[in-house]
């Protein structure tokens, strides 16, 4: 076999992988532009508004690991909900926080739990909270809400949730940046909004389940309490997604209910966060793969889609990898006199589609020169992400903490 044929085979295989990733991004970016239908949920779970005789009750969980800098402000802010006080209860799972912080929290009208885990994780915190609440309270809740320690929500957060919550579906609220104090934080916020367009809004627009994002999540209490003990990794949101998809529970994305979330503002924090995500993505893919044949046979489109999501190349790496391969293909085509129209032009066309897809996914209010100029830090961040690949451990269940300060 000649060198030219080997090069063409490698080129084609690489292009298939990259083009598949690009098509996924472009397809759901375009889907996010579709008008919001009055009836966006599957017919089996169309919500009937609550009657006046019953208003939903909520258990609100704040897992907090080394979150002394932000947790008190978040809890005090949340307690200003305009929802009836007797219909919601806040529980903070304080893990490795100071005595001073715990004393302050204990003075508030909440439940403070202080577990002592050998190895901390958000999943363990949620499991501990549900176990304690179910054993020590006679209250029956309709829904459980999961928020991060740095999250800030509007006073009508629970009121708005109560209008759409349904036992047969999970809800993912619109998590958005509460800080953009430097280029890294701004870029992290931009990345999250692109994800919202592609993995949440775009999916819901065509009747598919949204992706979860780790906080701003709402579940039926009975479902959550029955499934939370199945969580066994450092990326509980991906595990929850898999459980929901296997059980046919729809995830509804609510764009109008905002959850303000602190974005990482340092390269070290960015690297830690992305390492956790990349490790979790690989772990989730390996966990979901065995059930994929059954999903294909039964036509479980949402489970198939979620499995594909775990196999996607991280977008910022793809943004650097694709033009690099374009240049390599162009040089190789010139050196070996390969037919350009079937060799390097397909790469440039794929890159153009990728850029178009990303641009479409950026909310219109963020398409400014100021925001786009902040992308100058991207090469440094991509390099950090690339080095993370060397540290991915498929069996590692250790929690990688992201520091919050705002």
Describe each region flagged by the PLM:
Residues 1-49, 364, 385:
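N-terminal membrane-anchoring/stem segments of glycan-assembly enzymes
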Residues 114, 119-133, 158-232, 275, ...:
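Long helical/loop segments within the catalytic core of UDP-sugar-dependent glycosyltransferases
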Residues 30-32, 312-395:
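Membrane-embedded multi-pass helical conduit in multi-pass membrane proteins
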Residues 91-102, 116-119, 152:
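A conserved acidic beta->alpha catalytic loop
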Residues 57-59, 89, 239:
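Cell-envelope/extracellular polymer assembly enzymes that use nucleotide-activated donors
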């Amino acid at each position: 076999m000649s060198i030219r044929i080997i090069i063409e085979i490698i080129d084609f295989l690489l292009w298939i992988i990259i083009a598949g990733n690009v098509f996924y991004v472009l397809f759901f970016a375009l889907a996010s532009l579709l008008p919001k239908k009055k009836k966006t949920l599957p017919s089996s779970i169309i919500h009937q508004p609550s009657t006046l005789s019953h208003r939903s009750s909520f258990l609100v969980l704040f897992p907090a690991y080394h979150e002394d800098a932000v947790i008190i402000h978040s809890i005090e802010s949340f307690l200003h909900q305009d929802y009836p006080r007797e219909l919601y209860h806040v529980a903070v799972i304080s893990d490795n926080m100071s005595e001073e912080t715990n004393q302050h929290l204990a003075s508030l009208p909440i439940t403070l739990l202080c577990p002592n885990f050998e190895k901390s994780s958000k999943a363990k915190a949620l499991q501990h909270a549900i176990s304690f609440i179910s054993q020590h309270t006679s209250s029956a809740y309709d829904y459980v809400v999961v928020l991060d320690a740095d999250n800030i929500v509007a006073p009508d957060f629970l009121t708005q949730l109560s209008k759409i919550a349904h036992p047969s579906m999970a809800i993912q609220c619109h998590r958005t940046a509460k800080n953009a104090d430097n280029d890294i934080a701004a870029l992290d916020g931009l990345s999250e909004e692109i994800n919202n367009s592609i993995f949440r809004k775009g999916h819901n627009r065509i009747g598919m389940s949204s992706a979860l994002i780790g906080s701003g999540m709402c579940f039926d209490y009975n479902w959550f309490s029955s499934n939370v003990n199945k969580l066994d990794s450092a990326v509980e949101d991906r595990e929850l997604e898999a459980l929901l998809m296997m059980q046919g529970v729809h995830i509804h994305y609510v764009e109008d209910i905002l959850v303000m979330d602190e974005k990482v503002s340092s390269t070290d924090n960015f690297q830690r966060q992305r390492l956790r995500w990349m490790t979790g993505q690989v772990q989730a893919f390996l966990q979901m793969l065995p059930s994929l044949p059954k999903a294909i046979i039964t036509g479980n489109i949402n489970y198939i889609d979620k499995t594909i999501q775990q196999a996607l190349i991280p977008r910022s790496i793809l943004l650097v990898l694709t033009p690099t391969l374009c240049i390599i293909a162009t040089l190789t085509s010139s050196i070996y006199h390969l037919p350009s129209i079937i060799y390097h032009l397909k790469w440039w066309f794929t890159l153009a589609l990728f850029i178009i897809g990303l641009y479409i996914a950026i909310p219109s209010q963020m398409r400014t020169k100021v925001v786009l100029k902040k992308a100058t830090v991207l090469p440094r961040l991509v390099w950090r992400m690339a080095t993370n690949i060397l540290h991915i451990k498929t069996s590692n269940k250790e929690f990688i903490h992201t520091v919050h300060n705002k």
